[in-house]
Regions:
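Short, flexible active-site recognition loops that position polar ligands and cofactors
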Residues: 222-234
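Short beta-strand scaffold segments in enzyme catalytic cores
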Residues: 91-98
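Signature of the SF2 helicase/ATPase Hel1-core->accessory helical subdomain module
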Residues: 1-14
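ATPase catalytic-site recognition across NTP-hydrolyzing enzymes
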Residues: 15-86
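Hydrophobic/aromatic beta-strand patches that form the interior of the parallel beta-sheet core
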Residues: 6-8, 81, 146
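Mg2+-dependent endonuclease catalytic cores in nucleic-acid-processing enzymes, primarily RNase H-like
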Residues: 104-225, 250-251
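Acidic two-metal-ion nuclease catalytic site recognized across multiple nuclease folds
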Residues: 245-254
Length: 254
């Protein structure tokens, strides 16, 4: 006996129960991503190549779509800093992100990479304190610092150093990263970009480059997997994602 199966493709437009505006918003948010084929067209599509195609194409075209307008005042509601610790060929990464009022969007405010080779914990803490002071001087707000939860010794050292500086109050705002699924983090940023709710400032150049060059690995067919072989800047991506991952539901209205 031979068993056969048929996969039926069901586009989202074939579902009459969904509100038209909901469908329109979903199409906008998923444009340019693998999720458009999967969730809008009802087609299975392997995740390959550039992850954030909209941003990469925008930077190549020089249209400035993802940069906050220079003539528009920016008033962050919350400012958060993400920290990823380097090692084994990777680098320390700091990213400051603004959450806009009502979770209406996010802005990459500033980012920095630090080479950890031949450096100690004090060197890392010094650079992070300098970064935090610059962010606070510019925006007058730091709600939290979210750090890679795998490095508790470094986190405790950062807290101790913060208590001895001008930003001593910030020591009690150092938290562990939530580390939700990487694919959920990717989908969150895709939704923000597609929905016109993601921007960058020039000071976030390493974040810009990390996002624009992020790739799917393509090593395991049928598996969504981000390339992490040292050829792309995963450290900065992680640091950025730590700043927004806890608000996945708020930022996606789910």
């Amino acid at each position: 006996m031979t068993l056969t199966s048929t996969v039926r493709r069901i586009p989202i437009d074939d579902n009459p129960t969904l509100p038209a505006q909901f469908v329109a918003d979903l199409k906008k948010e998923y444009t340019g991503t693998v999720y458009y084929n999967r969730f809008i067209l009802g087609q299975w599509m392997a995740a390959n190549g550039v992850i954030y195609r909209l941003l990469a194409d925008s930077l190549a075209a020089g249209d400035g779509r993802f940069f906050w307008p220079v003539d528009k005042p920016l008033h962050p509601w919350r400012v958060r800093i993400g920290v990823d610790f380097g090692g084994n060929g990777s680098k320390h990464a700091f990213v400051a992100t603004a959450i806009l009022p009502g979770y209406s969007g996010v802005v990459g405010l500033a980012s920095q990479r630090i080479d950890p080779v031949a450096q100690d914990a004090d060197f890392l803490a010094d650079r992070l304190l300098e970064f935090c002071m610059a962010v606070f001087a510019r925006w007058g707000e730091i709600q939290y610092i979210f750090c890679d939860s795998a490095e508790q010794t470094l986190i405790n050292h950062i807290r101790a150093r913060l208590r001895r500086c001008k930003l001593s109050w910030l020591a009690d705002r150092v938290e562990n990263s939530a580390k939700i699924r990487i694919n959920d983090r990717i989908r969150l940023t895709c939704i923000l970009m597609g929905g016109g709710r993601f921007w960058l400032l020039p000071e976030a150049s390493t974040l810009r480059d990390a996002l624009a060059t992020a790739l799917y690995s393509g090593k395991h067919p049928g598996v969504d997997e981000r390339l992490d072989d040292g050829s792309t800047d995963i450290d900065t991506l992680d640091a950025y994602e730590y700043t927004i991952e806890r608000d996945f539901k708020r930022l996606t209205n789910t």
